[in-house]
A protein has these predicted regions:
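The Walker A (P-loop) glycine that initiates the GxxxxGKT/S ATP-binding motif of P-loop NTPases
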Residues: 244, 308, 330
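Conserved alpha-helical scaffold flanking the Walker A/P-loop in AAA+ ATPase domains
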Residues: 231, 293, 304-325
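Hydrophobic residues in beta-strands of the RecA-like P-loop NTPase core, especially within AAA+ ATPase
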Residues: 129, 328-331
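Inter-Walker segment of RecA-like/P-loop motor cores
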Residues: 287-305
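Basic, amphipathic alpha-helical bundle interface domains used for macromolecular binding and assembly
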Residues: 57-68, 83, 90-100, 312-313, ...
Length: 531
């Protein structure tokens, strides 16, 4: 009994030492990006007793810690008072590292609410992000689209975002997107003393037709066989290797490939935009990426630049090309290690990056278009001064497993004089795109029960067996080609996939000998024409 009484007296004495008012607490809803998805972050601000100081906890990085100075100056320049005493800011959940300056605005609003300089009951209804300038202006931040999608999933009324990010957030249906120019405007809106019209986007008008000055296949003189090969590639989603001397138009043709691909669907556009948003590639006022990306990294690109990485993993070029085209010019000049690590993304459509900070998976479903010279000095084999061994070593910089994932090997010959001077207009990209879309529609109907198979290039062994059947004469032709033309065994499935696409372009139900014959001609390296 005596021990119990002593414990009770000690507890009463300890409680009596605490001040009656330990400060005011405010909570602001925000969010942060992990990979290409966002997760909710609760910004807790407590204005308490003690010496005037600001402490930020919850695994903030350097940019978040620096927000103390930005916020304090922005508060003063907005006409507010900097809270006296100890201000503690917690970014929850505390076990996930927080990056970037996007917490400036919610921290500042939380400090105003905790110090009773504003009165509002709206902090729980909006997700708030934004970087503060020293003048108290609100600057744009990265990753607003995934943050808006998270706000929608959390059932929030809307988001308070920098005005330059408002269009990006407004593509999310059913969400009030409030654009703010400065801290005072945001505070007065939450108090209800200032009205701000939500930004709205008409998604039906976002997907504009291609502008008249867009790149077009009609601008390319000659190279009809290469245009045909790229049409087949676009129709089936096949990867392509263009082989030819300098000046034959390889880059010019590759840059025009996106103009014959089917338009992005809304889900594709949202996923593509999320990737570009978190990297900061969206232009001010841009809501969605509505055209298929075309990325062309230099051959000196690092592993992290091409595949993604850094200390805190971010998307690389292969993810920025998601749902679009990745063009690798001078393919043999890329580091072999970089090319080899591309094999998994080419096969699976995503890339997984492991770092000390965590493991991230980024989408990477793209069409690979690579280009290379036929020999080290760029000349055709019969004109080259390189020895057969030098040519062989040059070609062998591209490994067999990587070639396994490239369906079409296309020779790009020099353009003839009569083709350069031909005044007749070439076929427009729009006409070619119509045929490509018709072939894609046939594939969508064929694979409607297999959502992971989006086009012929994505077929596995089961799909090839089911939809690439050959009659006896056609099988004999393929057998002859494999033997007589010295085709490698790895070419077999690729030829069947390409032949299926050629049949789809022709509107044919079955693969014929003509379709197989054309597919065989598109396997130059397997025919080993350079020894």
């Amino acid at each position: 009994m005596a021990g119990t009484r002593l414990q009770t007296e000690n507890r009463i004495a300890f409680d009596a030492e605490l001040p009656e008012n330990t400060g005011m607490l405010a909570k602001v809803c925000s969010a942060a990006v992990n990979g290409i998805e966002a997760y909710p972050v609760e910004v807790e601000v407590n204005a308490g007793w003690g010496d005037t100081m600001v402490v930020i906890v919850g695994l903030p990085d350097a940019a978040v810690k620096e927000s103390r100075d930005r916020v304090s100056t922005a508060l003063t320049n907005s006409g507010f008072k900097f809270p006296m005493g100890r201000t503690t800011i917690n970014l929850a959940p505390a076990d996930v590292r927080k990056e970037g300056p996007s917490f400036d605005l919610p921290i500042a609003l939380g400090m105003l609410a905790a110090s009773e300089q504003i009165e509002t009951d709206q902090l729980d209804h909006f997700v708030i992000v934004g970087e503060l300038a020293l003048t108290s202006g609100v600057r744009p931040v990265k990753g607003v689209l995934p943050l808006a999608l998270r706000a929608q999933a959390e059932g929030k009324i809307g988001v308070l975002v920098p005005a330059e990010n408002a269009t990006e957030a407004a593509v999310v249906a059913g969400l009030q997107v409030i654009p703010v120019q400065n801290l005072r405007e945001a505070a007065r809106f939450l108090e209800g003393t200032v009205r701000i019209a939500p930004v709205k986007v008409d998604l039906d008008r976002v997907f504009e037709p291609l502008a008249e000055d867009e790149l077009d296949f009609a601008e390319v003189k000659g190279q009809e066989s290469v245009k045909r090969a790229l049409e087949i590639a676009a129709a089936g989603g096949h990867n392509v290797l263009l082989i030819g001397p300098p000046g034959t138009g390889k880059s010019m043709l590759a840059k025009r490939l996106p103009t014959i691909l089917p338009p992005l669907t809304l889900p594709e556009a949202l996923e593509t935009t999320k990737i570009h948003s978190i990297v900061g590639l969206l232009t001010p006022g841009q809501g969605l990426v509505t055209r298929r990306p075309f990325r062309a990294p230099h051959h000196t690109a690092s592993d992290a630049g091409l595949l993604g990485g850094n200390i805190n993993p971010t998307p690389g070029e292969i993810s920025l090309a998601h749902h679009g085209v990745l063009f690798l010019d001078e393919l043999p000049e890329f580091k072999r290690s970089v090319l080899e690590t591309m094999r998994q993304p080419l096969e699976e459509g995503h890339v997984t990056i492991s770092r000390a900070a965590g493991t991230m998976t980024f989408p990477a479903q793209f069409m690979l278009v690579a280009a290379m010279n036929p020999t080290p000095d760029g000349k055709m084999p019969g004109e080259s001064r390189c020895s057969p061994r030098e040519i062989h070593n040059y070609l062998n910089r591209i490994s067999g497993p990587l070639l396994d994932r490239i369906d079409l090997h296309v020779e790009v010959p020099a353009v003839k004089f009569r083709e350069i001077t031909d005044a007749r207009p070439g076929e427009l990209s729009a006409r070619i795109r119509e045929r490509v879309m018709a072939a894609r529609h046939r594939q969508q109907a064929r694979f409607r029960d297999r959502p992971k198979v989006t086009c012929n290039a994505r077929m596995g062994a089961r799909e090839i067996k089911a939809w690439c059947r050959l009659d006896a004469p056609t099988m004999e032709l393929l057998k002859f080609a494999m033997t007589d033309l010295n085709l490698s065994a790895r070419a077999y499935d690729r030829i069947l996939k390409v032949a299926r696409t050629i049949a789809d372009l022709a509107g044919a139900e079955n693969i014929t000998a003509d379709h197989v014959s054309e597919a065989v001609q598109l396997r130059s390296l397997d025919r080993q024409i350079w020894g």
